[in-house]
Amino acid sequence: MPTINQLIKKGRKSAAVKTKSPALQSCPQKRGVCTSVKTITPKKPNSALRKVARIRLSNGIEVTAYIPGIGHNLQEHSVVLVRGGRVKDLPGVRYHIIRGTKDALGVEDRKRGRSKYGAKRPKA
């Protein structure tokens, strides 16, 4: 426990805030190339085959990113844009692929929440 004089001289050191997406290096998004595309199973109590891709970012860091939406066209060597945002039931997946940019096409026949999946407005 410090004395009053020690606190006056030095002061308290505030804890450094730890980033949740360190591979992006304070950028909103990063470009990357898919090295592999696969499915993984979520942790209990959920059950599914979640689509993920292993991506080498433009800064050389390799991350695992989730592919949102139903169906995708990604394969090895696809160029994608990656944003932060974890998937709660997939351990180690802390990034999302942005649909509708670069080689990742938007979700087909999406009517609601289109902007999150890169879907164009349907014809009336």
UniProtKB/Swiss-Prot annotation:
Protein name: Small ribosomal subunit protein uS12
Molecular function, one GO term: structural constituent of ribosome
GO BP annotations, alphabetical order: translation
Sequence ranges of Basic residues compositional bias: 112-124
Keywords associated with the record: Methylation, Ribonucleoprotein, Ribosomal protein, RNA-binding, rRNA-binding, tRNA-binding
Function according to Swiss-Prot or TrEMBL: With S4 and S5 plays an important role in translational accuracy.
Similarity comment text for this entry: Belongs to the universal ribosomal protein uS12 family.
GO terms for cellular component: small ribosomal subunit
Domain of life: Bacteria
Quaternary structure (record): Part of the 30S ribosomal subunit. Contacts proteins S8 and S17. May interact with IF1 in the 30S initiation complex.
HAMAP family given in the database record: Ribosomal_uS12_B
Region of interest called Disordered, as start-end residue ranges on this chain: 104-124
Entry-linked PROSITE patterns: RIBOSOMAL_S12
Provenance organism: Treponema denticola (strain ATCC 35405 / DSM 14222 / CIP 103919 / JCM 8153 / KCTC 15104)
Pfam families: Ribosom_S12_S23
Residue list for modification 3-methylthioaspartic acid: D89
InterPro entries (alphabetical): NA-bd_OB-fold, Ribosomal_uS12, Ribosomal_uS12_bac
